[in-house]
Regions:
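C-terminal active-site rim and adjoining tail of enzyme catalytic domains
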Residues: 15-20, 91-189
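Metal-dependent phosphodiesterase/phospholipase catalytic core, i.e.
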Residues: 1-89, 111, 125-127, 183-188
Length: 189
């Protein structure tokens, strides 16, 4: 299928009908909603040789190169983006992390919830990188991660995460947070 054909496809979910938007349409709508985006590149192997150049050009054309972090499972793509446009915050998605992080030329690592250990946060910070966890959609896990030293939480439940964060800041003393963490850690076992 061509890009135009894909963008013309109708999609339906939960009684709603729409079409697959272009990247430009998606970014335009996100800007209107003041919704920050985390862009994930998912190369499939048949990209043009100038794929990274095209992406960087599009981010700059849309004026979001300093606003929207970008990540991928493909480390080489992210290192190319970092080299060509250091102003774009780049991340390496790691589905399962054991041991030490690879010394990668990116700004952050994104690890799956399953792989999270607090020493990974320390390790990332020592490498001058941030650590994000994904995909955290459960209220209990969101609450726990909001009280851990991670730099970012990737979630589909943005409004819920923002509400939980606001409530934690507003209503909790340090002792309350400690009790909450103890309660969460015993319920996770």
């Amino acid at each position: 299928m061509t890009l135009a054909e894909v963008q013309g496809l109708k999609i339906q979910q939960d009684g709603h009908t729409s079409h697959i938007p272009s990247f430009e349409e998606f970014v335009t709508r996100a800007k209107e909603l003041k919704m920050p985006l985390l862009v994930e590149l998912k190369p499939h192997g048949a990209e043009p040789e100038n794929y990274v150049d095209l992406f960087v050009q599009k981010m700059k054309e849309l004026g979001v190169e300093k606003d929207y972090p970008t990540m991928s499972l493909d480390l080489s793509v992210m290192e190319k983006v970092e080299k060509k446009a250091p102003e774009i915050k780049t991340g390496y998605v790691i589905p399962i992390q054991f041991g030490q992080f690879e010394n990668a030329s990116v700004d952050f690592f994104a690890i799956e919830d399953f792989s999270y250990q607090e020493d990974l946060v320390t390790q990332a910070h020592e490498m001058k990188k941030e650590l994000y966890v994904w995909t955290i959609n459960d209220e209990q896990k969101l609450t726990a991660y909001l009280q851990r030293p991670v730099d970012g939480i990737i979630t589909d439940e943005v409004a819920e995460a923002q509400s939980l964060k606001k409530n934690l800041k507003k209503n909790k003393t340090y002792f309350d947070r400690f009790l909450s963490l103890v309660s969460l850690s015993t319920s996770e076992e």
